[in-house]
């Protein structure tokens, strides 16, 4: 018994105390920096009950939601997950720790780059970060070294690829003093030795689960995210909660093993005496009572009390890699994520596959015949064509021209058969053969031709004959004149299929056939050399908007906005402009009398007449003085009146309603060139520049505003004087689009652009007109027999031939001879049966009807090539043969007309990312887009250069007549003061009575406003086209500029921006031309006025500012005044 007790004590000590004492060396120190983690969720591993660390999901107060069965996930939301670091790690991080996360990616994020965890310092510079890159299938760990530089360690292993398969996975990173260890699904993937780390500033902020492009939460399903203060924890963690397939059923060993042994998942199995090897690295502990102490080996002990939890054991050696888990269940479709920010331009992708052939367009108009090309080289032999079905018999061609007399040929084959003999006995019935079968050569010798027999009954089909041997080429005949064209022979019988001939020369191009079936996708061709840039083409028409495409994957962050371009050089001064007549100036001081000169031109306006009677006072409350209206047109010049007496100065009346705008002035001299902004879309530039020139929609007519209230009368200020000319005001809001202007003259040609890339192969064009007959070609090889021709006309009666000797009895025709391959069987015609015995020659009878086809003759000798005949009409298309191998690409055909737009196809799967395309040709202005969302006001831009003098606007409607002002008090006549210095020009006095008619002046030159209008249009178009040509030549890569700003299609045009800052005052206009002579005034001559005083009246006081006018219509911004807010530069975390 004493030995038994000692053995029990030794067993207890070696089983429990020894591992417990050893484990004390690897425990963390939670009392220093790490709190104890909560334990209610860790029933799969008992030792986790005393783990210390940080649960980032709880620290960020993330909400829970069910994501698969009873598995819960954190809802990441749509706001950046960022907290103060000191709140997450109040006492900092230990030097060694472990990061453990369990998640699965979604379809939209399996190719995204995102931060799992990131600590920033107070300057928002990254100190520690863990990056998961779905595009490169890598995991990156970054920290700052002891010298402050960023150190980035990239783990790129084949074992990491399943991390992005949209299944649940555990990822762990063990951070030790000089070692980084990466675990996935409880397996060690790789370890890296690192340099010494720098201390971490915990006064900054911490970010989790954020996209690298815009910082928004990444679209993943996150189950847990913890940081353990024990760097060796990952080697002990189990993956039982990943999938049921990770947990094998418990065997008998599980019920007898101690809690310490099972909790370590077999990693410390060598410490257990007599313990068998575990079959799997994952042993899941059932949630039930724990096993007690083991009993003695030779006696069954009583159940012991529940043991105390054991300490952490020593780190076991890494186990063998587990088997690959089964594919997880399909995840529930997640919510649609928010639209991501534009990423940076990605690397050039591989060449995309060739697109499918488009639908056939309508036939284009036949182009003009091109010039005759040089004779091409002999093409390579084409692939052997399969025998197609017999085509439908074509129509008989027109008789050819009479050829030249040929040379004398060699002795021909035997002549036509003699006169008909008596009918022979019926032949034996031949075997039924399919149409076009093969014939074997007969065994009998060829007898002499007998006399022609009478027409026998139609015989049964004979046996097929075999292919005869190829005949030798005969010697060339003696040269003689060409014989006359013979009569058309009778159609021969269908022969057997001949031996495959050598490939013939390429035939003439056939008619355009119907489109073939869609071929298989060919392999992508290699990138050809870059062609020289082409001329700038005409803009293409705006296409119909396509269907909504599949949401693209997020790109890399974009780069910074490029610096604005330098302003263009100042243009040369233009020719002086032509202006409209100005108003007549006031009289100057009287000059000294000169000698009598010749008859002068029209005189200056006369002095103002005496003031009229005071009108009755107006009715109504005095209103504020309105703003100054535009000057009205000069009225008809009345006759000069007599000098009137000086009137009493009255109170200044209210300003009248605004008069109509004057007619458009001629263009002034050109100013500095407009610094056109580098817009990403030329269409938007043109729209802003000329108010949507393409649409040509007349502007809406402005609605006449309500009458303003009557202004208050201004107070009389005798000391007031006319103010100096104020600075040029800011440009008004642009008016609405005016009516369609007259067609301008053709502009100057633009600058020659670079040659464009080689276009796509065009659709084969229609056959061109037949060219002139070329020289006779070389002798061609013998072609295949042509289709059976139509029955010819009856030939003229030939001279009777000599009767041939009687032939020997024939052999039963069960097989044909070998030359039947040269002919085709007519429908319903059969091989003749036995020939009858030769009869005596009968008397010459009348020409009988055309007989059946005669017996097959021997092949004739090869004749000389005949003169090329005229091209016959095209026969009907034959039955389609089997598709041959694809031929070499033909020359591009004449472009056809644009076909009708086909139906919009279904959205296809996104193809692989292709390389950045070359810049396309600028298209035409697109159709006006839908009203965009009101953009945010942009920052105030720098002061622009001085703009050109604007073109005078159209004449506005005539304002209504203002209400009369109150009658002013009559002032007393003051004493005549001394003559002062010449004052500024005073306001015009009251209208005097009409004077006597003046002497008619000489007529002035007429001004044609249509010519002025035409000249304005011509000058505006010329300046616009010159500047557009310079702008387009400088803008060499519009597509590259667009792609640098954003990916994807450009959005609809935004609303008009806020008006820009006022420009500098424009240059003073030129003096107008002399106006036409006015019509004589109408009215009775007035009575002579009283002489006026020589003193000039005091100027009236300036009126008070008028009421605020109604807001004008929303205008379009001038391109040089438009402000385009630059996107803020994206802050990227650096990495090494």
From Swiss-Prot:
Assembly, in brief, is: Oligomer; disulfide-linked.
The glycosylation sites annotated in the UniProt record are 47
Cited function: May act as a cross-bridge between fibrils and other extracellular matrix molecules. Involved in skeletal myogenesis in the developing esophagus. May play a role in organization of the pericellular matrix or the sphinteric smooth muscle.
The UniProt regions of compositional bias labelled Low complexity, in chain numbering, are 254-266, 387-401, 428-437, 511-523, 567-577, 634-645, 764-788, 877-886, 1087-1101
Please list where the region (Triple-helical region 5 (COL5)) is annotated: 827-1006
Location of the motif Cell attachment site: 946-948
Boundaries of every Collagen-like domain copy:
292-346, 347-388, 389-430, 519-577, 578-618, 620-673, 722-777, 778-810, 833-891
Which gene underlies this protein?
A: Col19a1
Q: Where is there biased composition of kind Pro residues? A: 414-426, 800-811, 834-846, 1102-1113
| Position of the signal peptide | 1-23
Its name, as the record gives it, is Collagen alpha-1(XIX) chain
Species of origin = Mus musculus (Mouse)
Q: Where is the composition biased (Basic and acidic residues)?
A: 302-314, 332-344, 472-490, 714-725, 737-758, 937-948
Which family does the similarity line name? Belongs to the fibril-associated collagens with interrupted helices (FACIT) family.
Cell compartment(s), UniProt = Secreted, Extracellular space, Extracellular matrix
**Laminin G-like domain ranges (all copies):** 47-231
- Positions of region (Triple-helical region 3 (COL3)): 442-682
**Sorted UniProt keywords:** Cell adhesion, Collagen, Developmental protein, Differentiation, Disulfide bond, Extracellular matrix, Glycoprotein, Hydroxylation, Myogenesis, Repeat, Secreted, Signal
Instruction: List every stretch annotated Triple-helical region 6 (COL6).
Output: 1048-1105
Ranges for region Triple-helical region 4 (COL4): 694-812
Question: What is written about domains in the entry's comments?
Answer: The numerous interruptions in the triple helix may make this molecule either elastic or flexible.
Effect of a null allele: Mice show severe signs of malnourishment and the majority die within the first three weeks of postnatal life. Newborn homozygotes do not show gross anatomical abnormalities, except for smaller size of the internal organs. However, necroscopy of the mice that survive past the weaning stage reveals a dilated esophagus (megaesophagus) with retention of ingesta immediately above the diaphragm level. Mutant mice also exhibit an additional defect, namely impaired smooth-to-skeletal muscle cell transdifferentiation in the abdominal segment of the esophagus.
